[in-house]
Amino acid sequence: AAGVTFEQLNGFLTKTTTSKAHVNPVIFRVMPNTAIEVKSSMTFISAYNASQEQIDLLISIFNELGNAILIEERLMEAGTALASSGIAFALRYIRAAIEGGVELGFYPKQAQEIVVHTVKGAIDLLLENKSNPEAEIDKVTTPGGITIKGLNEMELSGFTSAVIRGLKASR
């Protein structure tokens, strides 16, 4: 359950059983996102009383369904905002870009195909080049060019702060 801590889970488990096996139970908190449906989830795992072997096994299972990382429990809610709510935030950008494409003259299906493949290309650049977004942005941004004009307009409208505020509100 979202927001339920190891301390709460451990307290519940130790109260509801008299078995000595549950005195120090192994507990995992796991938070995938909806992309697990297509084996592309970003999954967060936190462990309590688990051995490294148990942790490695769980990570390997969830890596079959996308990408899984071990995080401290204190980051679980932040991870949920970043990766789970993040799916909706990314889709909201995609929807806005599609609407912009239609305003530019493309049919909706064409605009969606263009935007989806453009976003996939951006993701592939980051993953394959092991680079950061700013480095990839710099490759396409020229002085006085259309890209910098568009980026500046997005920032004037509060794009970056809107994303950050949305993430913080989702914790």
Per-region residue spans from a language model:
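A short acidic, helix-capping loop that chelates divalent metal ions and anchors anionic groups
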Residues: 37-41, 78-80, 149
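Active-site capping/gating segments
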Residues: 29-44
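Hydrophobic packing residues within well-ordered alpha-helices of enzyme cores
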Residues: 9-13, 150
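Internal alpha-helical scaffold of NAD(P)-dependent oxidoreductase catalytic cores
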Residues: 12-26, 42-78, 90-130
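NAD(P)-dependent Rossmann-like dehydrogenase/reductase catalytic/cofactor-binding core
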Residues: 116-171
